[in-house]
């Protein structure tokens, strides 16, 4: 935690260790997320013309606008705000927000950001003594509506406590106002929210129980590479001494919180005064994901502008970004034969377990590992997943690809793979769709206003199967993901025999609308 003047920063989802900098971090390179490959030739992706957002208690400084110091921050901001207004100079400045911004858009040679040319809009909520979830929702909505309403991802490196929630016996059930706000905004503004996971002694878990974005835990280095879920993450089953805390501060029911992990231990970043500090926390894992969206979206927009085949405006959908990044995550290091999809690292939980030892690998009703979700962010692999383009259910599909489609209640969409799959190779499939949250818009201005609320219309139940090409009986699947509580399904399994296969998206149970939009990403190895 940090204080700056009168600043009362109880909302930050972070454990920060301020140490002298000894070794510069390489979290965006091959020790971390492999984004440096995309920044270099021939890709040359820097996030140009892509807008991303940041919502925090405070905000970073804007050089030439805020006269806090002679030092020029290593980033440029597209806009700075206090809630839904332009921020006044020298107000709501915060070291934590500055360091999070550095991860995303720093143009410094020593401490480069993931997407230095992205347009970052930063919004401050202000002192929590004078605000709470309504003000946080207002600030989020304001950031989502910047850049003419075209903001591709928003970073949340802060959170709210259950103790401050106005509900009686509040729990992480997706019903907090801020959580509903995030899921509503993700749908109506079509923006991917990336939420820093709960950690340390807890106390700041809202909105980690959202459905429509990505929640992250953070990793530490082992043998020079970010591979291990750090102990400070609250992302384990509720057992042992901390059982009562952990049980209260993870999702209610069977739905798991963590979707993806990213580097967050001992990251070197600049504060407001230009001092280099070593920091740790989920707060610094989340912006690795948020800024990676900017790199992918720059590439996607290039393909759209060039009118390349297998590209459409669907590439901008938040569900597509979620499915692509989760599906391309590292789990188990490939030995070089490609059977493990070219993965670059073996990721370990706190207790030294791999994804192949998880209940998510063994049980089709559990799509996510409790601690690592689908695995570790690999931005270059996400590019490989994304760059193969969109393939619809009306055509034979490539070995790697994605789609944005719809399915009707009690029906299914089949995606037939064009080429036979290789025996003993692994397949990765991710299906993502939204919970339906609606604004109770009392003044009918199509905006959230303080004192307004939301209506949760629930989550339709979709499943995903990998079936032999000629098989129509779902019970005879090769692999499946069949959760009844999640807004995503994920398959990672070996192919038993060579042959032709298809992916089936099944609309199992209708809760709200008859037609459900979804994003699907797949990665296979063909003969």
Give the ranges of each region predicted by the language model.
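Secreted peptidase-domain scaffold signal
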Residues: 342-460, 520-527
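Active-site neighborhood of phospho(di)ester-bond hydrolases with catalytic His/Asp-centered motifs
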Residues: 155-157, 193-198, 216
């Amino acid at each position: 935690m940090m204080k700056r003047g009168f600043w009362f920063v109880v909302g930050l989802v972070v454990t920060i260790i301020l140490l002298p900098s000894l070794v510069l971090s390489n979290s965006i390179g091959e020790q971390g997320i492999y984004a440096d490959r995309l920044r270099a030739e021939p890709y040359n992706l820097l996030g140009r013309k892509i807008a991303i957002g940041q919502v925090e208690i405070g905000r970073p400084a804007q050089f030439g606008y805020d006269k806090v110091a002679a030092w020029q921050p290593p980033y440029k901001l597209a806009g700075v705000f206090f809630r839904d207004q332009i921020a006044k100079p020298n107000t709501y400045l915060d070291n934590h927000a500055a360091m999070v911004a550095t991860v995303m858009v720093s143009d410094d040679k020593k401490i480069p950001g993931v997407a230095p040319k992205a347009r970052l809009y930063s919004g401050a909520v202000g002192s929590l003594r004078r605000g709470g979830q309504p003000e946080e929702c207002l600030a989020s909505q304001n950031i989502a509506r910047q850049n003419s309403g075209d903001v591709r991802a928003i970073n949340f490196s802060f959170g709210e406590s259950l103790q401050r929630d106005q509900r009686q016996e509040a729990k992480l059930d997706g019903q907090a106002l801020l959580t509903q706000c995030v899921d509503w905004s993700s749908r109506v503004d079509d923006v991917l929210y990336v939420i820093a996971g709960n950690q340390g002694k807890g106390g700041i878990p809202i909105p980690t129980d959202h459905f429509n974005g990505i929640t992250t835990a953070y990793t530490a280095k082992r043998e020079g590479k970010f591979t291990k879920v750090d102990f400070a993450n609250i992302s384990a089953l509720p057992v042992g001494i901390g059982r009562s805390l952990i049980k209260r501060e993870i999702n209610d029911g069977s739905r798991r919180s963590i979707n993806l992990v990213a580097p967050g231990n001992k990251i070197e970043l600049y504060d407001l005064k230009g001092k280099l500090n070593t920091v740790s926390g989920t707060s610094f894992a989340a912006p690795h994901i948020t800024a990676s969206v900017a790199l992918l979206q720059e590439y996607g927009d290039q393909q759209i502008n060039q009118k390349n085949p297998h590209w459409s405006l669907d590439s901008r959908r938040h569900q597509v970004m979620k499915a692509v990044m989760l599906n391309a995550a590292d789990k188990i290091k490939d030995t070089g034969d490609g059977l493990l999809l070219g993965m670059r690292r073996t990721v370990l939980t706190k207790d030294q377990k791999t994804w192949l030892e998880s209940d998510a690998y063994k049980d089709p009703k559990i799509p996510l590992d409790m601690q690592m979700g689908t695995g570790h962010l690999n931005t270059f692999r996400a590019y490989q997943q994304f760059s193969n383009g969109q393939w619809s259910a009306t055509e034979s599909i490539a070995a790697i690809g994605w789609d944005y489609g719809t399915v009707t209640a009690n029906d299914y969409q089949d995606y037939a793979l064009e080429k036979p799959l290789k025996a003993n190779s692994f397949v990765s499939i991710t299906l993502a769709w939204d919970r339906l949250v609606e604004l109770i818009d009392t003044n009918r201005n199509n905006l959230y206003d303080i004192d307004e609320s939301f209506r949760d219309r629930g989550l339709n139940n979709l499943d995903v199967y990998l079936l032999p090409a000629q098989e129509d009986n779902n019970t005879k699947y090769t692999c499946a993901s069949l959760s009844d509580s999640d807004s995503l399904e994920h398959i990672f399994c070996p192919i038993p025999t060579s042959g032709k296969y298809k992916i089936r998206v099944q609309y199992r149970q209708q809760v709200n609308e008859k037609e459900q939009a979804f994003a699907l990403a797949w990665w296979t190895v063909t003969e």
